[in-house]
Amino acid sequence: MWCLNMIMAESPGLVTICLLGYLLSAECTVFLDRENATKILHRPKRYNSGKLEEFVRGNLERECKEEKCSFEEAREVFENTEKTTEFWKQYVDGDQCESNPCLNGGMCKDDINSYECWCQAGFEGTNCELDATCSIKNGRCKQFCKRDTDNKVVCSCTDGYRLAEDQKSCEPAVPFPCGRVSVSHISKKLTRAETIFSNTNYENSSEAEIIWDNVTQSNQSFDEFSRVVGGEDAERGQFPWQVLLHGEIAAFCGGSIVNEKWVVTAAHCIKPGVKITVVAGEHNTEKPEPTEQKRNVIRAIPYHSYNASINKYSHDIALLELDEPLELNSYVTPICIADRDYTNIFLKFGYGYVSGWGKVFNRGRSASILQYLKVPLVDRATCLRSTKFSIYSHMFCAGYHEGGKDSCQGDSGGPHVTEVEGTSFLTGIISWGEECAMKGKYGIYTKVSRYVNWIKEKTKLT
């Protein structure tokens, strides 16, 4: 203190120097050591909530919970655009996946005002609610369905058609595709049947080769069975695949156009040595029509197992080769023929349509205008009980128990068709029956599914 008083008295400037020296000698460390500095700069590990990925809870609460934040402010917290985007979708309008909307094991991805379901193989739809396998509703395919190696549905179409943009429907790829009615004046009310794909396993559905006999019958020789009673007049062009078979004197059977050069009919319609003329585009047999096309048959091929001397109606199917190709148009169009499995599937839809110029009542006159009739499929047990004659596995019954409606004499060889989404497929050949339209009796048809491979092999166009 004595020194300080003396200095202050003699030189005030020295006071300043003394104070500065005192301060410099004091412990006032400006920088922290490494350990303490690390504690201050330490950032807590991000917490994974399971819903918002990793985030710094404190910063997120401050930035986006206490106050409304922008996307960029949230981006500063996450320091990652992908994680920020996922958080942002929930932050803006809540978690759309909270209610677990995706079914059948589908994974939900949240979005703004929406969500997206990532479906397991075999399922599709907004919520993976649709079983897309072929065993359920035919995989939603309009014609044919198969599974690929990943168990996914692949739809396909019959010849003359291609898949539409939806990859489910089929659209014509040629001017006059098989099984389509293209005459413009025929109204939609004449669409003849509904497609009903049931929840059945359609894969590997071919039937066993079983003979269902009531009685061993060597030769069912009953010409009166050569099989539309109770039908309706068809409009011109409504059944453009239907043909009329003419002998040297009169018409005697029907048939269906397979392609420009071939017709399919019943084998029992073929008579050795009888010249056959096929008339396509026919409607009214009592007058010439501009839509008619006549072709001579140059070759008749019954199915190789057909033997009329043993049984006139077993394997009752034959092919007719024409001398000149038919000119396809709206009145002359082939019928579609699916593969074996699908032909059998279509038959099981339950209803088909038969057509022809046969007798309009039992032992009555033949029709001049093409007739058609909707007939229900009859289960095999009922069919067997209805007759004493043999019903083989390559036959089926269709018709009405109460009678009054049936195919009849002159209709033999004509088509039994099933309409599938506006396209008709051949499912049977009119073969035989006991009388016509009798109560408790049914029409018997050749089951085309048993012969499709043979038909396609023999009728290939070269």
Curated annotation (Swiss-Prot):
Entry comment, domain topic: Calcium binds to the gamma-carboxyglutamic acid (Gla) residues in the Gla domain. Calcium can also bind, with stronger affinity, to another site beyond the Gla domain. Under physiological ion concentrations, Ca(2+) is displaced by Mg(2+) from some of the gammaglutamate residues in the N-terminal Gla domain. This leads to a subtle conformation change that may affect the interaction with its binding protein.
Gene symbol of the encoding locus: F9
Record keyword S-adenosyl-L-methionine present: no
Name the UniProt record assigns to this protein: Coagulation factor IX
Similarity comment: Belongs to the peptidase S1 family.
Residues the record lists as binding Ca(2+) 5: E72, E76
Disulphide linkage map: C64-C69, C97-C108, C102-C117, C119-C128, C134-C145, C141-C155, C157-C170, C178-C336, C253-C269, C383-C397, C408-C436
Species the sequence originates in: Bos taurus (Bovine)
Reaction(s) catalysed by this chain's protein: Selective cleavage of Arg-|-Ile bond in factor X to form factor Xa
Tissue: Detected in blood plasma (at protein level).
Ligand binding (Ca(2+) 1): Y47, E53, E63, E67
GO cellular component, one term: extracellular space
Residues that hold Ca(2+) 8 according to the record: E282, N284, E289, E292
